[in-house]
């Protein structure tokens, strides 16, 4: 193409660039075999909510099937151990379902016989007050599975007359502060709540520019969008494996309205926690 006036910059056609684009286009074309592999992987990564006893899928979302006024979600081993010791041992809880999922870090293929070291995601309600729900989730829910998890649990149009409490942990090195993280009294709690959550938190609120991650962030964002009162308690710790001091760092939450009345005997619960830690140490010891 010739220039039409002096000084005009003319781009000469480049065949090499065209060939590269054609090769990229061919690479993007999906073969029937590729499509089949992709569909199989998508089916494998599908999140399913099951009745644990019958292994059949729930026809509707969990909270559409059961009315809920209070929902406590523990995500990660230390948060799960806290609920197991202080909440579940203070009342009679009935299992209503479990999540089955598969990803790079989680294989919840068999949830019938679980030990404290296995990954799982199980839902319960309190027999004396069935509108109080609890979720223990020690498995990793991948980014592409989080929306599925929310849909299966909350549904597409959730009720707003319930309160959500989320407990989880992050490593203290994820905490952004002008101070040295080595000088921080680890473990420590921070809270983040939705606009509709009006109760006071039992610890300082999470400071900017700190952010939350993974499933806890997805649940809190979902609650913010749907105007559901929700609060996330985040324990920053330097020990991410099951740890007595980290679990006990959640204790201030026992005085909040969300958990008040669910814990009857704190000294007894502390003893149960110590037994749980001892059992876990024995199971984790390769020499026993």
Curated annotation (Swiss-Prot):
Q: Which residues carry this modification: Phosphothreonine?
A: 18, 54
Sites of N-acetylalanine modification? 2
Q: How is it modified after translation?
A: Degraded by the proteasome upon completion of 20S proteasome maturation.
Q: Where is the composition biased (Basic and acidic residues)?
A: 26-35
Query: What tissues contain this protein?
Result: In the adult, detected in brain, colon, leukocytes, breast and testis. Widely expressed in the fetus. Also expressed in a variety of proliferating cell lines.
Subcellular location, principal: cytoplasm
Q: Where is this region: Disordered?
A: 13-35
PTM sites of type N6-acetyllysine? 264
Which is one GO molecular function term here?
molecular adaptor activity
On the tree of life, the source organism's domain of life is Eukaryota
Q: Does the keyword Phosphoprotein apply?
A: yes
Could you list this entry's UniProt keywords, alphabetically sorted.
Answer: Acetylation, Chaperone, Cytoplasm, Endoplasmic reticulum, Phosphoprotein
| Functional description taken from the UniProt entry | Chaperone protein which promotes assembly of the 20S proteasome as part of a heterodimer with PSMG2. The PSMG1-PSMG2 heterodimer binds to the PSMA5 and PSMA7 proteasome subunits, promotes assembly of the proteasome alpha subunits into the heteroheptameric alpha ring and prevents alpha ring dimerization.
Q: Which family does it belong to?
A: Belongs to the PSMG1 family.
Q: Which PANTHER family does its entry note?
A: PROTEASOME ASSEMBLY CHAPERONE 1
Please state what the protein is called. Answer: Proteasome assembly chaperone 1
- Organism of derivation: Homo sapiens
């Amino acid at each position: 193409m010739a220039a039409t006036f002096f000084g005009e910059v003319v781009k000469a056609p480049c065949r090499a660039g065209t060939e590269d684009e054609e090769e990229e286009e061919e690479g993007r074309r999906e073969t029937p075999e590729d499509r089949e592999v992709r569909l199989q992987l998508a089916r494998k990564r599908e999140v399913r909510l099951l009745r644990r006893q019958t292994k059949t899928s729930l026809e509707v979302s969990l909270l559409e099937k059961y009315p809920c006024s209070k929902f406590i979600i523990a995500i990660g081993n230390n948060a799960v151990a806290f609920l197991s010791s202080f909440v579940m041992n203070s009342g009679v809880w009935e299992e209503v379902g479990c999540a089955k999922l598969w990803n790079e870090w989680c294989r919840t293929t068999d949830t019938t016989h679980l030990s404290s070291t296995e990954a799982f995601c199980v839902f319960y309600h309190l027999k004396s007050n069935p509108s109080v729900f609890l979720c223990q989730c020690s498995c990793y829910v991948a980014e592409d599975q989080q929306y599925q998890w929310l849909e299966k649990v909350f549904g597409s149009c959730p009720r707003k007359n319930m309160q959500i409490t989320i407990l989880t942990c992050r490593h203290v090195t994820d905490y952004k502060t002008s101070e040295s993280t080595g000088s921080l009294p680890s473990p420590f709690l921070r809270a983040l709540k939705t606009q509709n959550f009006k109760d006071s938190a039992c610890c300082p609120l999470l400071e900017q520019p700190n952010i939350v991650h993974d499933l806890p962030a997805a649940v809190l964002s979902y609650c913010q969008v749907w105007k559901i009162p929700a609060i996330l308690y985040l324990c920053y710790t330097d020990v991410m494996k099951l740890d007595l001091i980290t679990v006990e760092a959640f204790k201030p939450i026992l005085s909040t309205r969300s958990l008040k009345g669910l814990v009857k005997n704190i000294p007894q619960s502390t003893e149960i926690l110590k037994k749980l830690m001892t059992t876990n140490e024995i199971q984790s010891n390769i020499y026993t």
